[in-house]
Amino acid sequence: MTEAPTELPPEDRTPPREPGDAWVIEILREIEEEALRHFDPRLLTALGRYIYTRHGDTLEGARELIRILQRALFAHFRAGCGHSRIGQTRGGNPLSAIPTPRGMH
């Protein structure tokens, strides 16, 4: 049996790169689309203006907006959003239809 080769760092010894511009913009569009399903558009517009005044039209501003929207959506889902099963106690376990093995009650 042969051993797997060990993984080596990049030849130029540079640190890992940040995600590319296109990737950040794509993620921002996706998360904004999701946020519009759950939050008032006026709130999102105000948040966007706030980020723009702090960071301008930069990738750092886009990353900050992504971080804030991710946290807001997570908290919203945990609080029991009707569009999500995250954080909901009602409805039961989707695996409950599978019978429990004997002796595991």
UniProtKB/Swiss-Prot annotation:
It holds the Pfam family VPR. The modification Phosphoserine is found at S84. Residues 10-20 have a biased composition (Basic and acidic residues). GO terms for biological process: symbiont entry into host cell; symbiont-mediated arrest of host cell cycle during G2/M transition; viral penetration into host nucleus. GO terms for cellular component: host cell; host cell nucleus; virion component. Residues 1-20, 85-105 are annotated as: Disordered. It comes from the Viruses. The keyword S-adenosyl-L-methionine does not apply. Keywords: Activator, AIDS, Cell cycle, Host G2/M cell cycle arrest by virus, Host nucleus, Host-virus interaction, Modulation of host cell cycle by virus, Phosphoprotein, Transcription, Transcription regulation, Viral penetration into host nucleus, Virion, Virus entry into host cell. Gene3D superfamilies: 6.10.210.10, VpR/VpX protein, C-terminal domain. It is found in: Virion; Host nucleus. The keyword NADP does not apply. Interacts with human UNG. Stimulates gene expression driven by the HIV-2 LTR. Prevents infected cells from undergoing mitosis and proliferating, by inducing arrest or delay in the G2 phase of the cell cycle. Cell cycle arrest creates a favorable environment for maximizing viral expression and production. This is Protein Vpr. It comes from Human immunodeficiency virus type 2 subtype A (isolate NIH-Z) (HIV-2). The gene is vpr.
